[in-house]
UniProtKB/Swiss-Prot annotation:
Expression sites (tissue/organ): Ubiquitous expression among various organs, but only at a very low level.
Native organism taxonomy: Eukaryota, Viridiplantae, Streptophyta, Embryophyta, Tracheophyta
Origin species: Brassica campestris (Field mustard)
Gene: PAP3
Acidic residues bias spans: 117-127
Subcellular localization, as worded in the UniProt entry: Plastid, Chloroplast
Compositional bias (Low complexity): 53-68
Record's protein name: Plastid lipid-associated protein 3, chloroplastic
Biased composition (Polar residues): 1-37
Keyword line: Chloroplast, Plastid, Transit peptide
Residue range of the transit peptide in the UniProt record, numbered on this chain: 1-52
Family of this protein: Belongs to the PAP/fibrillin family.
Length: 360
């Protein structure tokens, strides 16, 4: 082990007697030698910047670039850049990290879109949407009942679909008082579909191979308070028409009481040529009628003579017995093209004669 010696000098105050000389004392004090593996960086000398006096003087003037401040290592720290005026303020979170705050969007009571040009613009748009929806429902109803032979051949699914569309149209009824709107109620209405049980025998007869229901229509006249129901049957030889005349009384703005008076059987209209189909289906079998059609061609002249003879005959009128001709009719939907009515448990869907619904 090495031993270090340190020299300590002790100074004493000068004696009052100058004749005595100064004698320093030397003491040797051993210290233990220690080794350290840690490298110590020699300290750098501290530099102190010039301290300005609080009282300015003429000779001590501030330099042109201002005073610079150095740290303990003699390096000049970079001055922090001042944030721009429009920069978002930083927010410190719980971890001490700074995040830029998101600028809030400007809140305004006015919508970005232009305001309506007039107060009724939104009402007009809603009205247009209602008209488009109603027209689509009417077209869908006409397409659904097409090919059902006025409802006689409609299955349960088709009947349920028709009833659903009818309910939607009744909810959009634009005419709440049909009887009080003769300009819409009056006229000739063509039957598109019915679920009236009393018409089923007639529709069944019209589904035979040589007899078809050509049309069923209803004419209403609010001035005379009368209704005329007409039916036309078509065969290869002639067309047969009969009608039922009734009077009605207004019970409510949408309901009338109907009383049938008499039925009328018009003379048949003999066709100038026999209009036979090429074949007919009977009990699931197809029967060819070409030979029968050729055999009846010589009888066309005879049929024309019969037609001219009976064309001038008056129609045959038959009265309705008792109260069997009484009924009621409730109109649940009415516009310029379509009318929906209910009566005695039956449903009637009719289109105005000449309407585009008949062309679908």
């Amino acid at each position: 082990m090495a031993t270090l010696f340190t020299v300590t000098t002790t100074s004493r105050p000068f004696p009052a007697n100058p004749s005595k000389t100064f004698s320093p004392s030397i003491s040797l004090k051993p210290n233990a030698l220690s080794f350290s593996l840690t490298h110590h960086r020699p300290p750098r000398p501290l530099r102190f910047s010039k301290i300005r006096s609080s009282l300015p003087s003429e000779s001590d003037s501030e330099p042109e670039g201002g005073y610079s401040i150095t740290d303990e290592w003699g390096e000049q720290p970079a001055e922090p850049e001042s944030p721009p005026d429009n920069a978002p303020s930083a927010v410190s979170d719980e971890w001490g990290e700074k995040s830029e705050s998101v600028p809030e969007e400007s809140v305004t009571r006015f919508a970005e879109s232009d305001p309506p040009t007039n107060e009724d613009e939104w009402e007009e748009r809603e009205a247009d949407d209602g008209v488009d929806k109603t027209w689509e429902l009417k077209r869908c109803l006409a397409d659904t009942v097409y090919g059902t032979e006025l409802g006689f051949r409609a299955g349960s699914e088709v009947r349920a679909e028709v009833l659903e569309i009818v309910n939607q149209l009744e909810a959009l009824n634009p005419t709440q008082a049909p009887v009080e709107n003769p300009e819409l109620l009056d006229g000739n209405w063509v039957l598109l579909y019915t679920a009236f049980s009393e018409l089923l025998p007639l529709l069944a007869a019209g589904s035979t191979p040589l007899l078809k229901v050509k049309s069923i229509s209803q004419s209403i006249d609010t001035k005379s308070l009368s209704i005329d129901n007409s039916t036309t049957l078509s065969s290869p030889f002639a067309d047969f028409s009969f009608s039922a005349t009734a009077s009605f009384e207004v019970r409510t703005p949408s309901r009338i009481e109907v009383s049938f008076k008499e039925g009328t059987l018009k003379p048949p209209e003999i066709k100038s040529s026999v209009d036979l189909p090429e074949s007919v289906g009977v009990f699931g079998q197809e029967i060819n009628l070409s030979f029968l059609k050729q055999s009846l061609n010589p009888l066309q002249d005879v049929a024309a003579n019969i037609s001219r003879a009976i064309s001038g005959q008056p129609p045959l009128k038959l009265p309705f017995p008792g109260n069997r001709g009484s009924s009621w009719l409730l109109t649940t939907y009415l516009d310029k093209d379509l009318r929906i009515s209910r009566g005695d448990g039956g449903l009637f869907v009719l289109a105005r004669e000449g309407s585009s619904l008949l062309e679908l």
